[in-house]
């Protein structure tokens, strides 16, 4: 089955072709970072308009790269949520219109299920069951995964997601958008031990997260340095390092608890923050200490992309899932509501 995948949940337009027998044939991505940087964050209306502009050229590009023609496509998968409604509607409308014109099925895919399954595109994919850490700008969740659509929420953030905390903290200390990669870059030049930030909610049982207080702690630290005339580039690096260390250690502690609670030894990390090198290294060390394994997608498939949507949609279509011809998207969509396959 050859599936065209379309991703438009936020500020990246992703298109890919995935074949159930041959694997990923082609993928293309256009990032709107430069468009939104001047505003310090994503402007939903601008994001939607740019998706309209980019979608069809990217579809033509992946068809050309894969050496395929439109008549060979068996189905279309598109992101139906969660995300920005206007942006989601661009992908959904395009998918349903093409599916109607080509007389093929279209299926809406859960954005976070796409992230969760992205490591399946690698040469050594994880086997079920496993624990997944979904960590992005909008989500921080620990999920037990027994199969596609078989999800048990173990814990999640009570306020800011980890990626959101990265971006907000970066903005507070004067870094450019997107802030997460900027903090990671500066942290490499940071002085270990100059600042020590708290590890929120690690001193109590459970698998819930909270990062809003950590963001406030970073702001107060930066303001104290600024009041003392010490708001220079090295201080930014030191604050970035302390913040990143706190987030990484908090996530690692909670992942270790989740693995112990479930009795599993396989951990998948997915979502944009899973590209963070410090997080990967910390989780690899933790899994090695318990003789377990950690899995993640290659960096370009950690952030939003069409390949993960094409793969996730293909699996559900192969399992017989169908969808009526209707344009429906959801800004909020708990993953536990998805049917198992």
UniProtKB/Swiss-Prot annotation:
The lineage of its organism: Bacteria, Pseudomonadati, Pseudomonadota, Gammaproteobacteria, Pseudomonadales. Its main location: cytoplasm. It catalyses: L-threonylcarbamoyladenylate + adenosine(37) in tRNA = N(6)-L-threonylcarbamoyladenosine(37) in tRNA + AMP + H(+). It is an enzyme of class 2 (transferase). Its cofactor is Fe(2+). InterPro entries: ATPase_NBD, Gcp-like_dom, KAE1/TsaD, TsaD. This is tRNA N6-adenosine threonylcarbamoyltransferase. Required for the formation of a threonylcarbamoyl group on adenosine at position 37 (t(6)A37) in tRNAs that read codons beginning with adenine. Is involved in the transfer of the threonylcarbamoyl moiety of threonylcarbamoyl-AMP (TC-AMP) to the N6 group of A37, together with TsaE and TsaB. TsaD likely plays a direct catalytic role in this reaction. SUPFAM superfamilies: Actin-like ATPase domain (SSF53067).
């Amino acid at each position: 089955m050859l599936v065209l995948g379309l991703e438009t949940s936020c500020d990246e337009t992703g298109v890919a072709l995935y074949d159930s027998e041959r694997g990923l044939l082609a993928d293309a991505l256009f990032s709107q970072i430069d468009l939104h940087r001047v505003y310090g964050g994503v402007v939903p209306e601008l994001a939607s308009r740019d998706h309209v502009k980019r979608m069809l050229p990217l579809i033509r590009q992946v068809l050309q790269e894969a050496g395929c023609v439109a008549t060979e496509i068996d189905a279309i998968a598109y992101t139906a949520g969660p995300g920005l409604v206007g942006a989601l509607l661009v992908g959904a409308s395009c998918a349903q219109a093409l599916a109607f014109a080509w007389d093929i099925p279209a299926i809406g895919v859960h954005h976070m299920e796409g992230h969760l399954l992205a490591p399946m595109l690698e040469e050594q994919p994880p086997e079920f069951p496993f624990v997944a850490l979904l960590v992005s700008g909008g989500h921080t969740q620990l999920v037990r995964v027994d199969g596609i659509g078989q999800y048990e929420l173990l814990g999640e953030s009570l306020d800011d997601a980890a990626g959101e905390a990265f971006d907000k903290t970066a903005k507070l200390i004067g870094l450019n958008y997107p802030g997460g990669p900027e903090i990671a870059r500066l942290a490499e030049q940071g002085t270990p031990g100059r600042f020590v930030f708290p590890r929120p909610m690690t001193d109590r049982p459970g698998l819930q997260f909270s990062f809003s207080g950590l963001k406030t702690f970073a702001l107060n630290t930066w303001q104290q340095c600024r009041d003392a005339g010490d708001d220079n580039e090295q201080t930014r690096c030191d604050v970035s390092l302390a913040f990143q260390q706190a987030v990484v250690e908090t996530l690692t502690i909670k992942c270790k608890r989740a693995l112990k609670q479930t009795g599993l030894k396989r951990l998948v990390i997915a979502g944009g923050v899973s590209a963070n090198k410090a997080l990967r290294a910390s989780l690899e060390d933790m899994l090695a200490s318990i003789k377990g394994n950690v899995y993640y997608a290659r960096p370009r498939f950690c952030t939003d992309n069409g390949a993960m949507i094409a793969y996730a949609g293909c699996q559900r279509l192969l399992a017989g899932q169908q969808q009526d011809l209707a344009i429906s998207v959801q800004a909020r969509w708990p993953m536990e509501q998805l049917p198992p396959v």
